[in-house]
């Protein structure tokens, strides 16, 4: 037996494993790095987040990614070079974290890397007859493995597509395994660049569980701030939005979109919801001369209404649901206030701290769970193709030499 296979086998047999989860979202804020102690697998999974940090991305990194990110046409040579470069870059960040945490890399069983999404393209979006769903994440896991000396599991989304899914959202697997409850109906709401949710009814019926993208959360607001406000990456404390007024005409135009009418589950991305989308809505509503503050106030409300529509759909199926939110959007208190107002049937809004997981770390933790399932799990019992959930083992293994 090859030593690498033997080591993986021994890791799988251990009662608990140390797994580093990596997540780099479409907001391009930074690399989330979560060191997790994961005990058991499947529905018996238990997690302790030992260390967590977000390593901020430099402007240089963001500039490089934005040259190809969510673009239908880009420089193929540049994209080819970015793939290994991002992997090496992420590997260096992991080494920095291990050094600062004073953790020996030899003690880590595996790294779980999501990579950097460059383009997400479900069939409902591209409309080509000859092709099904597609998604592309860069950041070669071989580069991470070689740079850190740690076996790396990555490229999780491709198996989901191979099994007939859209490659997203994958949160449902970890949410179901770790956050399901027999005491209450739960909605796990992730408020990143794109908002998505996982619906977890308390009856535990896996056929009723689903996960879906909802629509834009931070993606358009952040892009607008970055274009029109120097040296600002997002609307801190919603200060810009609070200084403006909601424009009804623009709000109506923003809400007029085919994706928003589709039933869940569905997926989307910044390929659809971006500044060009906003500009088209402004033109359609003759609101090009609005102040930046009014635009941001309207975008904030638009985001809230899109998310609220999805939450209210869920609560009709499961009364008294409790929402557990995570992601950068939870820090936008104006957005959260809108959600509370628009969702009176929701029993409560909390963040995942209440469930023992830092809301900023949740996605990195979820990919650590997927790696744990790849390594030590059994056949996944969550298999509901009608809801876009394939009962498959995800992840590709990259050895360190």
Swiss-Prot record:
One of its GO terms (molecular function) is phosphotransferase activity, alcohol group as acceptor. Keywords: ATP-binding, Carbohydrate metabolism, Kinase, Nucleotide-binding, Transferase. GO terms for biological process: 1,6-anhydro-N-acetyl-beta-muramic acid catabolic process; amino sugar metabolic process; peptidoglycan turnover. Pathway: Amino-sugar metabolism; 1,6-anhydro-N-acetylmuramate degradation; Cell wall biogenesis; peptidoglycan recycling. Its EC number is 2.7.1.170. InterPro entries: Anhydro_N_Ac-Mur_kinase, ATPase_NBD. ATP binds at residues 25-32. It catalyses: 1,6-anhydro-N-acetyl-beta-muramate + ATP + H2O = N-acetyl-D-muramate 6-phosphate + ADP + H(+). Gene3D superfamilies: 3.30.420.40. Pfam families: AnmK. Belongs to the anhydro-N-acetylmuramic acid kinase family. Catalyzes the specific phosphorylation of 1,6-anhydro-N-acetylmuramic acid (anhMurNAc) with the simultaneous cleavage of the 1,6-anhydro ring, generating MurNAc-6-P. Is required for the utilization of anhMurNAc either imported from the medium or derived from its own cell wall murein, and thus plays a role in cell wall recycling. PANTHER family: ANHYDRO-N-ACETYLMURAMIC ACID KINASE. This is Anhydro-N-acetylmuramic acid kinase. The lineage of its organism: Bacteria, Pseudomonadati, Pseudomonadota, Gammaproteobacteria, Alteromonadales.
């Amino acid at each position: 037996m090859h030593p690498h296979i033997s080591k993986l086998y021994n890791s799988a047999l251990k009662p608990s494993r140390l797994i580093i989860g990596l997540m780099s979202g479409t907001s391009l804020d930074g690399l989330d790095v979560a060191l997790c102690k994961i005990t058991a697998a499947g529905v018996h999974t238990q997690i302790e987040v030992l260390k967590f940090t977000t390593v901020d991305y430099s402007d240089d990194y963001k500039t490089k990614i934005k040259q190809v990110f969510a673009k239908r046409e880009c420089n193929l040579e540049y994209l080819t070079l970015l793939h290994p470069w991002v992997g090496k870059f992420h590997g260096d960040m992991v080494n920095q974290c291990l050094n600062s945490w004073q953790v020996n890399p030899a003690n880590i069983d595996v790294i779980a890397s999501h990579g950097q999404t460059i383009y997400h393209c479900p069939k409902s979006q591209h409309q080509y007859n000859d092709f099904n769903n597609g998604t592309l994440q860069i950041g070669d896991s071989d580069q991470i493995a070689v740079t850190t000396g740690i076996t790396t599991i990555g490229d999780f989304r491709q198996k989901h597509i191979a099994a007939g899914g859209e490659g997203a959202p994958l949160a449902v697997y970890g949410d179901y395994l770790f956050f399901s409850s027999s005491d209450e109906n739960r909605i796990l709401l992730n408020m990143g660049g794109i908002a998505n949710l996982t619906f977890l009814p308390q009856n535990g019926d896996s056929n009723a569980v689903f996960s879906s993208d909802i629509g834009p959360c931070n993606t358009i607001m952040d892009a607008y701030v970055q274009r029109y406000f120097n040296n600002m990456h997002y609307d801190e404390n919603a200060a810009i939005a609070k200084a403006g007024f909601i424009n009804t005409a623009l709000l109506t135009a923003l809400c007029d979109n085919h994706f928003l009418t589709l039933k869940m589950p569905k997926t989307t991305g910044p390929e659809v919801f971006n500044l060009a989308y906003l500009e088209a809505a402004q033109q359609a509503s003759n609101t090009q001369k609005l102040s930046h503050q009014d635009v941001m106030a309207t975008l904030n409300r638009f985001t809230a209404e899109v998310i609220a529509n999805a939450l209210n759909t869920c609560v009709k199926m499961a009364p008294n649901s409790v929402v557990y939110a995570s992601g950068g959007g939870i820090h936008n208190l104006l957005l959260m206030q809108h959600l509370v107002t628009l969702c009176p049937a929701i029993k409560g809004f909390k963040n995942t701290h209440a469930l023992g997981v830092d809301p900023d770390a949740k996605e990195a933790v979820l990919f650590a769970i997927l790696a744990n399932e790849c390594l030590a799990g059994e056949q996944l019992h969550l298999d509901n193709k009608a809801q876009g959930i394939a009962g498959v083992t995800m992840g590709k293994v990259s050895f360190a030499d």
